Swiss-Prot record:
Cofactor(s) for this UniProt protein: FAD
Main location: cytoplasm
Function, in words: One of at least two accessory proteins for anaerobic nitric oxide (NO) reductase. Reduces the rubredoxin moiety of NO reductase.
Organism: Salmonella newport (strain SL254)
Name under which the protein is recorded: Nitric oxide reductase FlRd-NAD(+) reductase
Length: 377
């Protein structure tokens, strides 16, 4: 008798995988185990909860029980997996164990919190659960410090500002979105945030946080300090690899998988934010959707290597949205930038004259798909 497929995790990657498996096989035993409630919510919505006055429970799209019934699953919510015996094909919690034929790690990633004095005062917004824990503090806060000027930090800064809060956005780098694109490209968003009233502290490093009668004092390495009501860490995500390590699976930044989403153990796979696919961590929706399609085939006996096309990444800053694609982080590209009142097109060209990356904003985003077709990958 088939012991079936076990998926550890309940986020977007896990759910996409379930849907793709069930399109091909209605009966293979499927078990999901996760530490949270397993209710479905749309994670990108977390970037807009404050301006839209949403509570954590407002984000719920489907209850876990409904999902289980719809897709014929066994669910084990609020269950911490303690260990994996890869040789015996057994997953263990504190008081249960499950046997599997194939195991999928969809354990996601955790928000990185800088190791500074007072780090326990920092909030993170990487899940519905985390937002539920701090939503009252964030709604009541008037002065907010966001540490990290990347994708999530920039989105949150705009959202909190649109909600009428006093926002300070801090980053070690000299420009926003520094790991994604050069300053001459990100400057349009940077100027817009400043015009909205966001106070930027660039080339700045946080040294410590202290609770005060008035709120929280944030002290920089420069010894400059500001008083705020809440501090949010938006300093990146770290793939959750602890379980994989305990199972003896090879990990690097993430759980290492090949083009078949297979780990170093032939019956263990990984998908989503926890996975490192041929050396790349791709915590974006489109690669996860494609990964789920291919992995479903492979779990059911197929042999389908994942092929990722050029894909768009969306920066969800509603007053100045951006789409980007290609190797925007490369430092050897020559950027051709056309900026008009209705938006910007920035093309990153190689020395051979090939389009290797682009960023488009506002009304010029409609040109993104045409540019994708000419992108050299």
């Amino acid at each position: 008798m088939s012991r079936g497929i076990i998926i550890i995790g309940s986020g977007f990657a896990a759910r996409q995988l379930v849907k793709n498996i069930r399109k091909q096989d209605a009966h293979v035993p499927l078990t999901l185990i996760a530490a949270d409630s397993m209710d479905e919510y749309n994670k990108p919505d977390l970037s807009h909860v404050i301006s839209q006055s949403q509570r954590a429970d407002d984000l719920t799209r489907q209850l876990a029980g409904e999902f289980a019934e719809q897709f014929n699953l066994r669910l084990f919510p609020h269950t911490w997996v303690a260990d994996i015996d890869a040789d015996a094909h057994v997953v263990k919690s504190q008081d249960k164990q499950w046997q599997y034929d194939k195991l999928v790690l969809a354990t996601g990633a955790t928000a990185f919190v800088p190791p500074i004095a007072g780090r326990e005062l920092m909030l993170t917004l990487n899940s519905q659960q985390e937002y539920r824990a701090c939503e009252t503090q964030l709604r009541d806060a008037q002065r907010v410090l966001i540490v990290g000027g990347g994708l999530i930090g920039s989105e949150l800064a705009m959202d909190f500002c649109r909600a009428g809060k006093t926002v300070t956005l801090m980053d070690n780098a000299a420009s926003l979105l520094a790991s994604l694109m050069p300053p001459e490209v990100s400057s349009r968003l940077q100027h817009h945030l400043t015009d909205m009233g966001v106070h930027l502290l660039l080339k700045s490093q946080l040294q410590k946080l202290e609770k005060t009668e008035a709120g929280i004092r944030a002290t920089l390495v420069s010894q400059h300090s500001i008083e705020v009501d809440a501090v949010i860490a938006a300093t990146g995500l770290r793939p959750e690899t602890a379980l994989a390590r305990r199972a003896g699976v090879v990990v690097n930044r993430g759980v290492c998988v090949d083009s078949y989403l297979q780990t170093s153990h032939p019956d263990i796979y990984a998908i989503g934010d926890c996975a490192e696919i041929n050396g790349q961590v791709l915590p974006f929706l489109q690669p996860i959707q494609l990964s789920a399609m291919y992995l479903a085939k492979n779990l059911l006996g197929g042999n389908a290597p994942l092929k990722l096309p050029a894909m768009l990444v969306k920066v969800k800053t509603p007053e100045l949205p951006l789409h980007l694609a290609g190797e925007t982080q490369r430092r050897d590209l020559s950027w051709q930038i056309t900026a008009e009142s209705d938006g910007m097109i920035a093309k990153g060209m190689s020395g051979e004259g090939q389009l290797r990356a682009f960023v488009v904003s506002e009304d010029r985003m409609k040109e993104a798909f045409a540019l994708l077709k000419t992108l050299s990958v």
